[in-house]
């Protein structure tokens, strides 16, 4: 018999740095989940992605057990790392703050293709390209 789902929680946590402090503690605490158990497992599974914010989708069951799925880091995070910038431009159409080679966009699209709503890799690259433009990044060949 399938376990009954009590709730689904979506969080964005720094890889390898989950602690019982907010936002993790309050989000899991309201379902009575073992917070430390989640933190240890999450930190172990994301240790290789240090420096990124990693989205996670947690499913909590009626018996207070849980499972979680780790997604790929947000495109904006990957683009910031690729362009060596701290944040996007406040005026993306007027002020360009960095350059990203098209090859790097392809690499980012490959990383994110599982989470993107794209039929093929070219469509995924166009999505990443749009994100780069809206951050004030210039795409170079």
Swiss-Prot record:
CDD domains listed in its UniProt record: Ribosomal_L11 (cd00349)
Processing and modification events after translation: One or more lysine residues are methylated.
GO molecular function, one term: structural constituent of ribosome
GO aspect biological process, one term: translation
SMART domains membership: RL11 (SM00649)
Keywords: Methylation, Ribonucleoprotein, Ribosomal protein, RNA-binding, rRNA-binding
InterPro entries (alphabetical): Ribosomal_uL11, Ribosomal_uL11_bac-typ, Ribosomal_uL11_C, Ribosomal_uL11_C_sf, Ribosomal_uL11_CS, Ribosomal_uL11_N, Ribosomal_uL11_N_sf
GO cellular component: cytosolic large ribosomal subunit
Pfam families, per database record: Ribosomal_L11, Ribosomal_L11_N
Protein's UniProt keywords contain Ribosomal protein: yes
Family listed: Belongs to the universal ribosomal protein uL11 family.
Assembly with partners or alone: Part of the ribosomal stalk of the 50S ribosomal subunit. Interacts with L10 and the large rRNA to form the base of the stalk. L10 forms an elongated spine to which L12 dimers bind in a sequential fashion forming a multimeric L10(L12)X complex.
Function statement: Forms part of the ribosomal stalk which helps the ribosome interact with GTP-bound translation factors.
Protein's name in the database: Large ribosomal subunit protein uL11
Gene symbol of the encoding locus: rplK
């Amino acid at each position: 018999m399938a376990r009954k789902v009590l709730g689904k929680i979506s969080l964005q946590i720094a890889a390898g740095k989950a602690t019982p402090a907010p936002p993790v503690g309050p989000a899991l605490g309201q379902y009575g989940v073992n917070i430390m158990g989640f933190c240890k497992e999450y930190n172990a599974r994301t240790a290789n992605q240090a420096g990124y914010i990693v989205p996670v989708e947690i499913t909590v069951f009626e018996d207070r057990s849980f499972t979680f799925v780790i997604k790929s880091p947000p495109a904006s995070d990957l683009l910031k790392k690729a362009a060596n910038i701290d944040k996007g431009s406040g005026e993306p159409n007027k002020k360009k703050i960095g350059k990203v080679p098209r090859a790097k966009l392809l690499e980012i699209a490959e990383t994110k293709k599982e989470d993107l709503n794209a039929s093929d890799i070219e469509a995924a690259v166009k999505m990443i390209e749009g994100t780069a433009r809206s951050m004030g990044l210039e795409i170079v060949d």
